[in-house]
């Protein structure tokens, strides 16, 4: 929503599952045709990494089938599509940063379904961009920062892993990066974006409660 505030010259449609079920092919195609959509930015996903192992069908439906429907509808309407993806398309064992040229190697249902979703988007829409990000947080929705703030108020102590390293990324910064891609003209391909610096989930939690 930061894009709408900073770039009000465009018309934006923000949808949730009540307004548009992106798993419903007919609903997607009808909506895009009626609204004359020129660009789709898909931020929707099944993001419960652990639960995805037991809910593989739902994860596949939301992370793979839904992006395919969006991409197909975008292509039919002459629209571009940006698919927001994840660092989980890699297994996290590398000791150097992952670049766009690195071969994906997911080791979870979540990562696998997100990778398949990337492929579907690239296969079904000529003007397609995949942007991978990591450890996303925002004032909207559920995310690690909001969870830690809530748990910090409810509990005297918290147990947080310290051996997983990543880069927390502010959703507003990701939105601005997406707009930069749009503003310069959609160049088909895969992009990586995150904020700077690295930390563990433990370090991140400590920083959250210092603020």
Which residues are covered by each model-predicted region?
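Catalytic helix-loop patch of NAD(P)-dependent Rossmann-fold dehydrogenases
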Residues: 61, 65-69, 89-131, 135-136
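Conserved catalytic-core motifs of eukaryotic protein kinase domains, centered on the activation segment
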Residues: 50-57, 92-96, 141-142
């Amino acid at each position: 929503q930061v894009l709408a505030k900073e770039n009000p010259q465009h018309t934006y449609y923000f949808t949730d599952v009540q307004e548009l079920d992106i798993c419903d092919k007919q609903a997607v195609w009808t909506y895009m045709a009626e609204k004359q959509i020129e660009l789709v930015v898909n931020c929707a996903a099944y993001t419960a990494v652990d639960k995805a192992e037991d809910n593989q069908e739902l994860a596949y439906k939301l992370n793979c089938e839904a992006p395919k429907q969006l991409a197909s509808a975008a292509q039919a309407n002459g629209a571009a599509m940006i698919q927001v993806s994840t660092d989980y398309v890699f297994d996290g064992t590398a000791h150097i940063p992952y670049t766009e040229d690195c071969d994906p190697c997911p080791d979870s249902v979540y990562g696998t379904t997100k990778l398949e979703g990337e492929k579907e988007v690239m296969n079904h829409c000529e003007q397609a961009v995949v942007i991978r990000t990591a450890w996303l947080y925002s004032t909207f929705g559920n995310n690690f920062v909001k969870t830690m703030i809530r748990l910090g108020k409810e509990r005297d102590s918290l147990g947080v892993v310290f051996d997983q390293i990543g880069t927390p990324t502010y959703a507003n910064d990701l939105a601005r990066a997406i707009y930069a891609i749009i503003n310069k003209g959609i160049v088909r391909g895969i992009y990586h974006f995150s904020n700077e610096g690295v930390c563990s989930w433990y370090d991140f939690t400590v920083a959250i409660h210092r603020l």
